[in-house]
Each structure stands twice: as C-alpha cells, then as structure tokens.
A protein has these predicted regions:
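Conserved N-terminal subdomain of the carbohydrate kinase-like
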Residues: 11, 40-121, 303-308
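Alpha-helix C-terminal capping segments
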Residues: 29-40, 85, 254-256
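Short catalytic helix/loop segments, enriched in acidic residues and glycine
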Residues: 17-32
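A short, aliphatic-rich alpha-helical micro-motif
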Residues: 110-112, 171-172, 203
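Conserved beta-alpha-beta core of the PfkB/ribokinase-like small-molecule kinase fold
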Residues: 124-199, 216-217
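Conserved phosphate-binding/catalytic region of the ribokinase-like
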Residues: 138, 194-308
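Active-site metal-binding loops of divalent metal-dependent hydrolases
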Residues: 5-7, 26, 122, 151, ...
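Positively charged, low-complexity intrinsically disordered leader regions
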Residues: 1-14
Length: 308
C-alpha cells in the first residue's frame, strides 16, 4: 500500500490541558496502522529538516513504513496542530503550518495492480501540491492500482471551496473509490444523504462511493445498488481523531488480503462489502480507544486474522 499526504505533530488537549503529543496526518495515520498490520507499505510526502521531522521518520520506520519517498526538507518547518477533545472524544483543531508546496523534484515508488494508493484531504487538492499529486495519480493509474480518495474536507477550508471544487472533482474522476463523511458533504454540497450525494455529484465521476457518519451507518453506493451497514458500538472512546483514517487503513488492508483488484470493485456484492467494512470498522474502533491516531501494536499483530 502507498499512502500520500502531509505529516503533522498533533498535541492533544482535554479539559484545556495537554494529554499527549502524537505523530499525525490523515494518510500518515492510515499508513502507520497498515504497517502495524503487517502489510508492506510506503509513505509519499515530506517533513521538515528539524527534530519533529526526524522523530516522524523514525516513528514510521519503527512501524514498518518505508520512508524512502518522504524527504526531510530544509525549506519546510514541520507542521503542528492543537487538537481539543470534547466530552465525546471529538476534536476541534488549530493548525500551525506553512502553505503546502511540492518539492522541485521527486521520485515515486513502484506501483502495480495488486497495490492500493490512499490519498486525500487538503493536501491532495491544494494548488501547491498539485504537480506531485497529479504525477502520483497518473503513475498509479498506469500501474492499474486501486486509487482510494478520502475527501476529508474540513470546514476550515470552506472559504476556498469554489477554487478547490474543480480539483476535488478531478480527484474523484481519477479514483477507484471515493470516501467521505456526512460532515464533509454538508460543507461541500449542503447534503448529508449518501444516495443523494452519489446521484447528484459522485456517480458521474467514480462508480464506488462510501459515506460514513461517525457512529451512524456506513453507506456504500454502487452503480447497481445502495448498501447500508451498521457500525459496531464503541463504548470506551478516548479520541476520534484517527477514526476515519483507520477506517481507510482497515478497508485498504482488507482489499489487499482478499485479493480484490480495481476492475472487481463495481461488481462486489453485499456479502463482500460486509467483510470489507467489518475490518474497516474494527480498525477504526480500536484506534478510538486510545489517544494515539492509529491501531495498537497488539491489535496490528492479530489484524490479519480478522474475519476479512
């Protein structure tokens, strides 16, 4: 699996007091969980040439993530976020980071039909990173990989929506799976109903659409059907910061473990999707039980034995 995105240091607060500092970033969180689950993986991105950047790379390597395509850049300061948790473990954020800009040159990992590329968030739609993102998407398309796009559009970027929407639509068009939350689509389209969003906005761009809604049902919209699956209850929630990222990680791992390729996706039936989403929800639920942004090491060691 290949993850592409930003790296950031999350400082997590509860009741106004710092509780933990954890390495983060949407695709970053996913790829760490994939590495802990024993799936070969690589991260494409960058970090600053500073102590935070060095710790970030060391952390990825310790979790079996290839960092050959994530350079430390002297022109970049590592990003930091403050995540303030409410009583439900949901976070509101304050970000301290530079405007994203692609490096002057880069190399990309090999990618083939058995692989999954995961990307998304503001990183994938902002102008500064577009040259790198477009090159990676073309590379993954040529290799026949599953391209998994998590829109993950935060309300903090709503003032840029008009400028970013054409790029978001282009990302959808070039992807095999589009996922987003009901919150994302309320900001983007003023809609929360998955079937309506699919019919009006996604179907013409990408055949496979997954809409999550926190503890609510997961909806999978396909050309031939709309499927809804309940989400297992998680009682001991510590933080939901990595919930969606780990849903992505679990789904990607399950696709790889089950040998599902790009051309098989639109025709998958309800039973197959139930297997895929069970693993996705198991990853997400485990990550919600701690202040970390990823599955636990212990869960990762037994993850491949889940009923995938």
């Amino acid at each position: 699996m290949i993850g592409m995105g930003e790296t950031i240091m999350d400082i997590i607060f509860r009741n106004g007091q710092p509780q933990a500092a954890v390495h983060g970033g949407s695709s970053f969180n996913s790829i760490v969980s994939v590495g802990r689950a024993g799936v070969p993986c690589v991260f494409v991105g960058d970090t600053g040439a500073d102590i935070v950047g060095r710790q970030t790379l060391d952390f990825m390597r310790a979790n079996h993530v290839d960092t050959d395509y994530c350079p430390m850049r002297p022109d970049v300061k590592s990003a930091v976020s403050l995540a303030y948790l409410d009583d439900n473990g949901d976070a509101s954020y304050v970000f301290y980071k530079q405007k994203p800009e692609a490096p002057k040159e880069w190399t990309l990992p090999q990618i083939g039909a058995d692989d999954v590329l995961l990307y998304g968030s503001y990183f994938s739609s902002c102008r500064g990173m577009r040259p790198l993102v477009e090159d990676m998407l073309s590379h993954a398309t040529a290799g026949g990989a599953i391209i998994y796009y998590d829109i993950n559009f935060r309300s903090s970027h709503s003032h840029e929506l008009v400028a970013l929407l054409p790029t978001i639509e282009d990302n959808c068009r070039r992807s095999s799976i589009v996922r987003g939350s009901a919150d994302d689509f309320e900001v983007l389209f003023g809609q929360r109903d998955a079937a309506t969003i699919y019919d009006r906005h996604i179907r013409k761009l990408c055949p496979v659409f997954i809409c999550t809604s926190g503890a609510g049902a997961v909806t999978v919209c396909l050309p031939h059907d709309t499927l809804r699956f309940p989400v297992p209850r998680v009682d001991d929630v510590a933080s939901t910061v990595g919930a969606g990222d780990n849903f992505n990680a679990g789904l990607a791992c399950s696709l790889i473990w089950r040998g599902i390729r790009k051309d098989m996706l639109p025709a998958l039936g309800s039973e197959e999707w139930q297997h895929l989403l069970a693993t996705a929800c198991a990853f997400s639920g485990n990550a919600c039980r701690t202040l970390d942004n990823y599955i636990s090491v212990e869960f990762g060691l037994r993850a491949s034995g889940l009923p995938v």
